[in-house]
Amino acid sequence: MMGTVAEERSQPSLVRDLVMLTKPRIISLLLVTTVAPMFVAGNPGWLLVLIMIIGGYLMAGGANAVNMYLDRDIDTRMSRTRLRPIPSGRMEARAVLAFGVALATAATFLFARFTNVLTAALALAGFYFYVFVYTRWLKRTTPHNIVIGGAAGAFPPLVGWAAMTGTVDLTAVYFFFIVFYWTPPHFWALALLKQRDYGKAAIPMAPLVWGERETMRQMIWYNVILIALTVLPVSFGAFGTIYLASALVLGGILLAGVIRVTLVSDWTRAAWQVYKFSLLYLALLFVAMVVDRKVGG
């Protein structure tokens, strides 16, 4: 009896599986890049921020759930994904699809009802881009999957800006491109570490197609472009000293980490450090924008 109870407690619950489908760790960063632009644009009320957090989680969670539905065949072949709800047999594929669509539908209604139609449309566009353009098409066909598909993760700043201003201007587009150029080196660091897994699933990630050295060189170039892009608005007076110092320090640390990956013979630890720090980098960069605008401005 005791053994049965212990076994039941050790097995994932339905609630835990539903949360797993949404990929909450990934969503937390997306929410930072959604909310921060709102504070750069003005002073959003707590209710609007709450709506954006809830709606953003629902939309991104829905996209992630549908992603797991579409990737159920390759998830069974990869060690890091085979324990997900569908490949492990804990949930039916159709139930996961219905769950994902329901979350996205709820998010669309929430945005349209309590913000504006543009916000809902942009959020839904990000959903469709991630699900169909990236997951269904690019991921399985080209090593440029992350380069082009990275646009999906760059929609949240547009959504946050539109919720606050009702428009998408050059500032919002600038935020979009920061995330866009940040994405490839971030995911290529993971691809270097998990390339055998991707190989088993026949996913043409950059290290498998271009080779490790070329992937590392591409990571350096993308980081150089990213640094140049992050400091650009300072020359136009959009941000001040606080943001400039943050962008240079954070960008310098990230670039140094990527260069270190290319210099050491065993780059496993260095690649992990780049992958983890890149997450912190993006969050801190967007926070620095807010601090600069509210304190320095």
Could you describe each region identified by the protein language model?
Residues 2-13, 70-91, 188-216:
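Cytosolic, membrane-interface loops and tails of multi-pass inner-membrane proteins
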Residues 32-34, 38-72, 80, 121-132, ...:
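Membrane-embedded alpha-helical segments that form the functional core of polytopic membrane enzymes
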Residues 32-35, 84-85, 147-164, 213-214, ...:
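Small-residue-rich segments of transmembrane alpha-helices in multi-pass membrane proteins
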Residues 58-66, 129-135, 177-195, 227, ...:
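Transmembrane alpha-helical segments that form the membrane-embedded catalytic/substrate-channel core
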Residues 80-121, 212-235:
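Multi-pass membrane catalytic core of lipid/isoprenoid biosynthesis enzymes
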Residues 93, 97-164:
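Intramembrane alpha-helical segments
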Residues 158-168, 226-233, 281-297:
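Hydrophobic alpha-helical transmembrane segments in multi-pass integral membrane proteins
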Residues 255-284:
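Interfacial loop-to-transmembrane junctions
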